[in-house]
Amino acid sequence: MTQQLNHAKVNQHPGQATLPETAEGQVRTYEVKTYGCQMNVHDSERLSGLLEEAGYVAAPEDATPDLVVFNTCAVRENADMRLYGTLGNLRSVKEKNPGMQIAVGGCLAQKDKDTVVKKAPWVDVVFGTHNIGSLPTLLQRAEHNAQAEVEIVDSLEQFPSVLPAKRESAYAGWVSVSVGCNNTCTFCIVPSLRGKEQDRRPGDILAEVQALVDQGVTEVTLLGQNVNAYGVNFVDPELERDRSAFSKLLRACGEIEGLERVRFTSPHPAEFTSDVIDAMAETPNICPQLHMPLQSGSDKVLKEMRRSYRSKKFLSILDEVRAKIPHASITTDIIVGFPGETEEDFQATLDVVKKARFTSAYTFQYSPRPGTPAAEYENQLPKEVVQERYERLMVVQEQVCEEENQKLIGTTVELLVQAGGGRKNDATKRMSGRARDGRLVHFAPEGDIDGEIRPGDFVTVTVTEAKPFFLIADSGVQTHRRTKAGDNSAVGQVPTTAPIGVGLGLPQIGAPKVAPATESACCSIN
């Protein structure tokens, strides 16, 4: 999964009379810094929701917040250095602002526990992946006791869906279907930090999706460490195990009016079944996009990784997907330099990459993570060997990406317009959007336009140029559809989702009842 840094946006809390205050009687502000994968991004939405429910408001840009929360990652080797380097920079800031608090959560906090405070004693709160709901209480306790509060629990206290959330996007939302993972990949530390897989009730998931759609969201990504294992470990003991539960969930999403795009990440090749592919092919709003982690093309390395599939099985899945969804875009994850990887093993990975024709690949150089079996393997590779293989893989994958993108020149695609400028925006004034298959397209915002194009609107364009990692559409906009999400984006309004309790959802698969329509003064859907 990709590394990224995200910041909370400004959102004024309506009930300021009850807000926590600084010593000067001012409202406390916060900033959440997120490192790591999509799971962390979504957890940070929950953290923002919790803090705003507790009375904090997000700090304006360039202002020093009263509270800084780090939601950390432990997957990559440099995660520790990034965190402690940033904490070191904050030490002097905190010394100049005595009332400032710093909290560290996420996977690195879960892993390091007491080490965080030993290395950075100016940190006020350390919390883990299983108790993010405790953050407001821990902050109060740290302030009252004038000492650091460290609370790491070994198992999930409550499913994150029971926590409020402040979403980052007006048009696209993450929805967790599960937490944790039951796989035992030898390179991965996530199961020891996130715990065993626990699956949400289908009705809770669909209710959250409906709540987002009611607020204008048109695209939802179903999120889990291994989404196609969904149904094996329901948190509700009354629900029976159902290995076809994920395909049923996808079809149920197809019944939700107003939900135009559904994506999911990430599946596991060993458990990816034909019923999911059929649901993708037969449900119109399921996007023709599949992220299928390869990790290695060598069967020997896959065995050492404990991945429980082989390259032939992997390629057969792609063949079935393309037979049923010919225009599907398939992306992947690849690790280079796993302990014991030979040149022959690496060539096997290159061979699979050439056969698989991935639209894009998240490629990582292996780094040993303490606490994982692979970190103890004796045959670790020299860094220069790993770097050289990584560079060769990037050349091959980049060529494949460009060749696949070249096939789309002259085709017309529908884009969900994204926030942020397009390629070389200052010179071209291009905007950016995502096609249904997930490809990034930079387009010229001119032509048949209904007023200003906003993030969250839909446009159709014709691809005029292809690059390895994006497409360009400079022939103008053919159609422009304004949306409620676009209206919300224009005024800086993002969705919020109220707590959805594990025990309150509907036990059966199926679209929830549609909530009564709500009118927005800024809504104009054409």
From Swiss-Prot:
Residues annotated to bind [4Fe-4S] cluster 2: 181, 185, 188
Could you name the Gene Ontology cellular component terms for this entry? cytosol
What is the organism of origin for this protein? Corynebacterium glutamicum (strain R)
Please state every residue range assigned to the domain named MTTase N-terminal: 28-144
Q: Which UniProt keywords apply?
A: 4Fe-4S, Cytoplasm, Iron, Iron-sulfur, Metal-binding, S-adenosyl-L-methionine, Transferase, tRNA processing
State the InterPro entries in the record.
Elp3/MiaA/NifB-like_rSAM, Methylthiotransferase, Methylthiotransferase_CS, Methylthiotransferase_N, Methylthiotransferase_N_sf, MiaB_methiolase, rSAM, rSAM_horseshoe
Q: Give every Radical SAM core domain span.
A: 167-403
PANTHER family tied to this protein: CDK5 REGULATORY SUBUNIT-ASSOCIATED PROTEIN 1, MITOCHONDRIAL TRNA METHYLTHIOTRANSFERASE CDK5RAP1
Catalytic activity field: N(6)-dimethylallyladenosine(37) in tRNA + (sulfur carrier)-SH + AH2 + 2 S-adenosyl-L-methionine = 2-methylsulfanyl-N(6)-dimethylallyladenosine(37) in tRNA + (sulfur carrier)-H + 5'-deoxyadenosine + L-methionine + A + S-adenosyl-L-homocysteine + 2 H(+)
Function, please? Catalyzes the methylthiolation of N6-(dimethylallyl)adenosine (i(6)A), leading to the formation of 2-methylthio-N6-(dimethylallyl)adenosine (ms(2)i(6)A) at position 37 in tRNAs that read codons beginning with uridine.
Q: How is the cofactor bound?
A: Binds 2 [4Fe-4S] clusters. One cluster is coordinated with 3 cysteines and an exchangeable S-adenosyl-L-methionine.
The answer to keyword 4Fe-4S applying to this record is yes
Tell me yes or no: is Plastid among this UniProt entry's keywords: no
Q: Where is this region: Disordered?
A: 1-24
Record's protein name: tRNA-2-methylthio-N(6)-dimethylallyladenosine synthase
Q: Which domain of life is it from?
A: Bacteria
Name the cofactor(s) required for activity, per the record: [4Fe-4S] cluster
Residues binding [4Fe-4S] cluster 1, per UniProt: 37, 73, 107
Any one Gene Ontology MF annotation carried by this entry is:
N6-isopentenyladenosine methylthiotransferase activity
